[in-house]
């Protein structure tokens, strides 16, 4: 599993000109599920993200979690995160888990975050989406599990 975590002031995802997900301060998560991932990996990723302290405290240190700042989550599935670019010029996506299992695991991931008390908005699995955001920092982390 690979998750790109972007600290944002706000973010939204549109499909066919209609907003389907919209958050204020929080995390934009771009989520890639790979072959071999299972519920234990999903739970570990959700737990790590829930506890990640990348918001600044009153002293300017990255010491606060998403929960500490009452942040929200926008989760967007993105199989292209699993691209292999080692050979040639065309990325290979054989590492990416195929639907419907990848969709189920992405939905389970979002439920885990909701169960941790977060407001979670999502894109639509497999759709052509337009994602807009205002980075805060920018502060971006790639979580590989």
Curated annotation (Swiss-Prot):
Any GO BP: D-amino acid catabolic process
GO molecular function, one term: D-tyrosyl-tRNA(Tyr) deacylase activity
Catalytic activity as recorded in UniProt: glycyl-tRNA(Ala) + H2O = tRNA(Ala) + glycine + H(+); a D-aminoacyl-tRNA + H2O = a tRNA + a D-alpha-amino acid + H(+)
Protein localization: Cytoplasm
Any one GO CC term of the record: cytoplasm
Uppermost EC category: hydrolase
InterPro entries xref list: Daa-tRNA_deacyls_DTD, DTD-like_sf
Enzyme Commission number(s): 3.1.1.96
Keywords: Cytoplasm, Hydrolase, RNA-binding, tRNA-binding
Gene3D superfamilies: D-tyrosyl-tRNA(Tyr) deacylase
UniProt motif Gly-cisPro motif, important for rejection of L-amino acids: location: 137-138
Main location: cytoplasm
Source organism, top-level taxon: Bacteria
Function: An aminoacyl-tRNA editing enzyme that deacylates mischarged D-aminoacyl-tRNAs. Also deacylates mischarged glycyl-tRNA(Ala), protecting cells against glycine mischarging by AlaRS. Acts via tRNA-based rather than protein-based catalysis; rejects L-amino acids rather than detecting D-amino acids in the active site. By recycling D-aminoacyl-tRNA to D-amino acids and free tRNA molecules, this enzyme counteracts the toxicity associated with the formation of D-aminoacyl-tRNA entities in vivo and helps enforce protein L-homochirality.
PANTHER family, per the entry: D-AMINOACYL-TRNA DEACYLASE 1, D-TYROSYL-TRNA TYR DEACYLASE
Family: Belongs to the DTD family.
Oligomeric and partner information: Homodimer.
This protein's domain notes: A Gly-cisPro motif from one monomer fits into the active site of the other monomer to allow specific chiral rejection of L-amino acids.
Name of protein: D-aminoacyl-tRNA deacylase
Organism: Lactobacillus acidophilus (strain ATCC 700396 / NCK56 / N2 / NCFM)
């Amino acid at each position: 599993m690979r998750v790109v975590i972007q600290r944002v002031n706000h973010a939204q995802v549109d499909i066919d000109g209609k907003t389907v997900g919209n958050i204020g301060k929080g995390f934009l998560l771009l989520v890639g599920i790979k072959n071999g991932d299972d519920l234990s990996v999903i739970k570990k990723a959700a737990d790590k993200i829930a506890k990640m302290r990348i918001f600044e405290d009153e002293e300017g240190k990255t010491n606060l979690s998403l929960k500490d700042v009452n942040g929200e989550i926008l989760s967007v599935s993105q199989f292209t995160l699993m691209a292999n670019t080692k050979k040639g010029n065309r990325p290979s996506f054989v590492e990416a888990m195929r639907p419907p299992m990848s969709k189920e695991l992405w939905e389970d991931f979002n439920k885990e975050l909701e169960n941790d008390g977060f407001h979670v908005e999502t894109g639509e699995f497999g759709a052509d989406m337009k994602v807009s955001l205002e980075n805060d920092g920018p502060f971006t982390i790639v979580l590989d599990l």
